[in-house]
Amino acid sequence: MSYPNNKENSNNIGGGSFSVPSKQPQRVLQQQNTNINNHQTTSTVKSTITKPTTTGATTSTNTSTIPPTTTASSSSSSSSSSSSSSSSSSSSSSSSSQSVPKKKWCIDDFDIGKLLGMGRFGHVYLAREKKSQFIVALKVLFKNQLQTHNIEHQLRREIEIQSHLRHPNILRLFGYFYDDKRVFLIIEFAKGGECFKELQKVGSFNEQTAATYTLQIADALRYCHSKHVIHRDIKPENLLIGVGGEIKIADFGWSVHAPNTKRSTFCGTLEYLPPEVIEKKGYDQTADVWSLGILIFEFLVGRSPFTSDEEKNIFHNIQENDVYYPSSISPEAKDLISRLLVSDPHQRITLKDVINHPWIKKHAHPKSLEPTKLGLPLPSQMTY
């Protein structure tokens, strides 16, 4: 569930409310790089929230995936006094490297602000962690809805995957907790709101905006694929815009970690599905590459290339793969899209080649991969 900018006032879910400042607090807090496979990234996103070490009564029994800032306790005094100095050093090093227990969160740790958006299974609120004053979005999911639609396993997978991803163009999932009726996800606040809402406002994006977003998404997907993660639902509704105008891939509800095997699950959004998915032939990471081609087309035209009022016609259009390119699409953009929308998944352009494509090189913002230096206005605020 993504969230738009919503001006409605919220019904407080945890007591207290506040107004978001014009800028994110200039606060850099400690974090640990507990990435998948312990991979070190070059992400410039340094701000995170950290649980204070003080204890108190909570109504939650679950633990957060947010790395604590406390360090492990010093080596035990029960070590043998007869050990050699090298042995003592080794013991101390081993003890100090022990993992610190994860901290527990509850709703009382947050000031709850306005309602940002509503989805099928819950709501998203602006929130502020009381100790650090860090601004986040709090996604509140209702257990009865999750159980009714049998998607508890999907939520667990989403948490497991998204909480381990570290990339400036992937929305951070800092942690989670729950009570008797609700599950709370602590996620990064993307001030620009939904990409889809911006696309609706302006009809279509100019080439600089489209190329910049495409470059950022391609780089983020390349990172995901290096971790054997397939998103499986890339579309404007699942993209958010950060404070610097950068795109953020969100909603990993359909994502899967698939190191060695092809997938066969029919999932995602119909107009974005590649032929191998609808024909149930099995698919891999190249399914995301096809979806990127659909996305670029929609960025530039305002609709997907295979859209239809009839579901059966969408199936037919995807299988035929006969794309009509309006004259407004430049030759370079058409070339890139046509290289992505190839029916044979093995013949599609790679994400590395997308990043280095002439259309990207010509139109993408020079600071596209440096979000802290980007400063790109929202499409609806641009002067054309």
Swiss-Prot record:
Its GO CC terms?
cell projection; centrosome; chromosome passenger complex; cleavage furrow; cytoplasm; kinetochore; nuclear envelope; nucleolus
**InterPro entries of this UniProt entry?**
Aur-like, Kinase-like_dom_sf, Prot_kinase_dom, Protein_kinase_ATP_BS, Ser/Thr_kinase_AS
Which Pfam families is this protein grouped with? Pkinase
Is Cytoplasm one of the keywords? yes
For the ligand (ATP), the binding residues are 116-124, 139
The similarity annotation says:
Belongs to the protein kinase superfamily. Ser/Thr protein kinase family. Aurora subfamily.
Could you identify this protein by its name? Aurora kinase
- Recorded source organism is Dictyostelium discoideum
Name of the gene this protein is made from: aurK
